Amino acid sequence: MVLNDAVIGVPYTIRDIQTDDVELDAFLRRLGCYSGQSVVVVSRNRKGCVASILNNRYSIDADIASAIII
């Protein structure tokens, strides 16, 4: 399941980040988005979702959210 498919308000554990883009992978790691970390989708809109990672909220577009496997 990818982050786009997550139910709002339910905590999930990140299993993997599937991207060939080294810069995107490094960026997500700096945000605390890596395997084993907890993530909760707070809200969703047409362009993506707002996710809580390490007690911080981030607006994540749909393309990036589809690379986050939960």
Model-flagged regions — what are they?
Residues 1-2, 70:
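Absolute protein N-terminus
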Residues 4, 15, 40-42:
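Conserved positions in beta-strands of structured domains
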Residues 17-19, 30:
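A structural micro-motif recognizing beta-strand termini
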Residues 23-27:
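Short alpha-helix capping/helix-loop boundary micro-motifs
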Residues 42-70:
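C-terminal structural segments of small proteins and small subunits
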